[in-house]
């Protein structure tokens, strides 16, 4: 009689093996589709990692300033203000205060704001002024040294947001249910056109606006403004803003959607078009020169029982989501299921955005965890180097400002960044038959630390507790590796092997195999190029 032990020993001694390839997930993750029919270039999860040449861990964050803006509060506004020839300030709002950084400490701009109100901050470069608005208080203007309330005849009493357009300053005023008006001239202190004279009331309420044009400019024939409404999205445009519209030539076009946006911090210009998070928890892209928003967030909308995506954003927290276009990605930060702070990010690779054969857009990467971001700000003006700044969303941590994605920073303020990739479920030839795991080979940059490796079938983990020790042959810094022996060339690419069967410590049988590779370090990150799995086919069907 042949026992199961005899069968396993026979497997150990078998010579017939098959090699299965696992490429890096260039198509990103897919939480929406059938887990069995995912593309080999898709992944179930890419936590804290993304594809750029190889699959690499994200960089970490450091505090911009060790002192809180306001003790034990969250950040509710952040902006980089450029003015004059080469002047710049970081403007921040927390609790009741608007403050700026002097270069060594936080200093007050205004201390009488309504506590905790999300603030939209905009620069009008032509006047060297920045405008801070929250929809409750009079808007505050700041020129780098002195502050004042927004003023003028018919001035908005409770501005939600301002936006320079053509030679005017547009404003959404909460006093009139979020309707729009604008300055009557090239000034913010003179006369303002009345809302009734402007006649721009496309929705029951407007929440925010951004420029919508391929060159991200408020001038030019194609320059338009995307308005976020309660019940839809709208495009405002015109070269002559004299009122009424029969005198000027401005107009409002409603887009082909009944879904609005109440999360103005998620509205972003990208080279592909304007993006935003809708009130239905879907991410939309409005390509330039079209009137039809495309839903592009399906792949981060989970239909799997063990993973969550944007579908679990609490209804009361949609308005607090935020996003930024940075380093080729649309980076979306939001609160997870049952949470009140933004703890999760997903990144859409705009440089490689594509619709797949199922009609879904990607590549998306994430979840990115370990950072609690309430609002982002790019530092991409004169004298800056494209730094990505962020405000703290969790008041129990404190009102800190961080620099994210910092070169050479491999931790989040000293906390290791947990990176892992879980691949698609490879059918290993015939998914009706079982295979025995024999050996795994990884092609990667040989930095330092330890990789944890697990093998999963669709019903759970089959083999866990495996480790691969990296040799420290390459030192990572930013986007560059240096070998230990020669700091002038890239670090070494290595092949690392893990034996499971055939003398490697046991045999595991499965029908489909998803690799889960994890890494965590405060001094390094990983960069993986390919994985190959050697299995021994069995003549064992399902039972």
Language-model segments: which ranges?
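Beta-sheet repeat architectures centered on beta-propellers
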Residues: 2-128, 258-274, 278-543
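Beta-propeller and closely related beta-pinwheel folds
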Residues: 62-75, 110-118, 147-280, 284-320, ...
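Short beta-strand element of the conserved SAM-dependent methyltransferase core
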Residues: 92, 121, 141-142, 227, ...
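Short strand-coil-strand connectors
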Residues: 95, 103, 133-135, 144, ...
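Hydrophobic or amphipathic alpha-helical targeting/insertion segments
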Residues: 120-150
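Proline-rich low-complexity regions
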Residues: 139, 154-161, 423, 427
